[in-house]
Regions:
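Short internal beta-strands
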Residues: 31-38, 220-224, 357-360, 382-392
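C-terminal helical cap/extension that packs against the catalytic core
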Residues: 50, 237, 376-434
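Short acidic/histidine-rich motifs immediately flanking catalytic phosphotransfer sites
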Residues: 68-74, 162-163, 432-434
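N-terminal leader/targeting and accessory segments in enzymes
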Residues: 1-100, 104, 219, 249, ...
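Beta-strand->loop->alpha-helix junctions that form or flank phosphate-binding loops
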Residues: 36-37, 55-60, 99-106, 144-146, ...
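Nucleotide phosphate-binding/pyrophosphate-handling subdomain across enzymes
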Residues: 2-8, 18, 25-29, 256-258, ...
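Phosphate-binding loop of NTP-binding sites
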Residues: 25-31, 48, 62-67, 79-222, ...
Length: 458
């Protein structure tokens, strides 16, 4: 189905962060946009205010009539939805065009210049940073992001003049194989989603295949030292980047007085005096990648500086809620051992002499089973670790796989305890903290507004 032929779009799994960005795209085109989600959330409520029709019961009768014409309705679904879902079965049985979110994005990369960011971690911050730099420049861009940009209050950026689209390329379920990037950053290839891939080798092969999809004339910007083989088409340039070395890197890094500045070293043009609007050490590396992609597509030195200085961050990515001399409280989406390591390392660099406590909710039974020792090692960088029950998301429990696997492997000297998420608010009321961070991609984040309020009132 061509995008020009679509009159209505129905989403099965409307409230996911990636799905909602596409929903907003079709809302901007003045189409009928509706969908199902399992539970209401802040995001679904926002979509409803913007004009989307959403229901929360798995019921074919609740699908709007405007979305029941197979000739003019596109159905978009998330892989997290089971194949036996009643509404999905209805659409299959009645000949509807049914596409994954990634297929829709793939179509857009064929009609626009796709600037894609892939990788096990760092892709949301890097893609959002790149989108902000591009959007405030003379070039502009559209963007489909994996988090809510604090600069724009949304995960979707619309431009009616730019041919560029910035996309977070998701490796889950091999979704990024639908894309045809003009350029792509690859931030990291630490194995993940082994419930899908089975082996580390299959995971790395998936990224290798992804590099084949970059269009001739474009470029691959890959983090230096990754354990993968790229296989680009003729005419695709390859650049390496990292914090300290590569074609693109940072020099003269200064972390002082709560701020971070550095010089951006580039084969095109060096940019001195770059200031991070969100001064977190990991954003030096993310910033180098984002600036590289933006510079390769025509952003000037002043636009790069201004974009980095005014970048406000992403919800749940090093998201500071309270920041003063007495107390620091932040929320971070880190849910892979390497992400947690980088978050913990950044927090430790910022607050060298303060006690750092993490409340961590592991995400997925399979990920916990596969990486519990790595989780324990990363969390052991902190002074105190409070573990919640595993957030299952799409999975069923696995016998013997609980948060205690991580608990038992934390290094000696780390204060540790286990807690049910329902008891977190009482814990916060009855404890004093120096630096407190909520870690994980589950639903513990729903408590963050209440935790913030409790801490502010103390």
């Amino acid at each position: 189905m061509e995008i020009k032929d679509i009159k209505a779009v129905y989403f099965v799994g409307a409230g996911g962060i990636g799905m909602s960005a596409i929903a907003r795209y079709f809302l901007s085109k003045k189409l009928v946009v509706a969908g199902y989600d399992k539970t209401p959330s802040n995001l679904t409520h926002e979509l409803e205010k913007e004009g989307m029709l959403i229901h929360y019961e798995e019921n074919v009768d609740l699908i709007p009539e405007a979305c029941k014409d197979a000739k003019t309705t596109l159905v978009v679904y998330t892989p997290a939805i089971p194949a036996e879902h009643k509404e999905l079965v209805f659409f299959h049985e009645n000949g509807f065009t049914i596409e994954k979110r990634a297929q829709v994005l793939g179509t857009l990369t064929r009609t626009h210049k796709g600037l894609c960011v892939a990788g096990t971690h760092g892709k949301t911050s890097t893609s959002t940073m790149c989108a902000h730099i591009m959007h405030q420049s003379h070039i502009d861009c559209n963007a489909f992001l994996g988090g809510i940009s604090k600069n724009y209050g949304t995960n979707y950026i619309l431009s009616d003049k730019s041919d560029y689209v910035v996309i977070e390329a998701d490796e889950f379920d091999r979704s990024f194989h639908w894309l045809r990037p003009w350029m792509s950053v690859i931030t990291a290839t630490d194995p993940d989603h082994l419930d899908i891939y089975g082996t580390k080798e299959a995971y790395l092969e998936s990224f290798r295949h992804y590099t084949e999809l970059i269009q001739p004339g474009g470029a691959l910007i890959i983090h230096k030292g990754l354990e993968m083989k790229q296989h680009v088409q003729a005419g695709v340039k390859i650049y390496e980047y990292s914090q300290d070395e590569g074609d693109f890197h940072a020099e003269n890094i200064k972390i002082e007085n709560g701020g971070i500045t550095f010089d951006f070293i580039s084969p095109i043009e060096n940019v001195t005096g770059v200031e991070l609007g969100q001064p977190v050490p990991i954003n030096i590396t993310n910033g180098v990648a984002a600036m590289a992609m933006a510079q390769l597509n025509g952003c000037t030195a002043d636009e790069l500086r201004n974009g980095m200085k005014t970048y406000g961050g992403v919800d749940r990515r090093f998201d500071f809620k309270i920041k003063n001399n007495k107390l620091v409280f932040l929320s971070d989406y880190a849910h892979h051992p390497k992400e947690i390591y980088q978050s913990a390392k950044s927090i430790r660099e910022l607050y060298k002499d303060r006690k750092i406590t993490a409340i961590f909710q592991p995400h997925l039974y399979t990920r916990t089973r596969d990486f519990y020792k790595d989780f324990a090692n990363s969390l052991s960088l902190l002074d105190e670790v409070i573990l919640c029950d595993i957030y299952p998301a799409r999975e069923q429990p696995i016998p013997g796989v609980t948060s205690k696997l991580i608990y038992d492997n934390l290094k000696p000297g780390v204060e540790k305890s286990m807690i049910h998420k329902e008891d977190v608010l009482d814990l916060v009321k009855n404890r004093d903290f120096d630096v407190l961070v909520i870690l994980g991609a589950g639903d513990l984040d729903n408590y963050v507004p209440q935790i913030t309020k409790i801490l502010e009132e103390k």
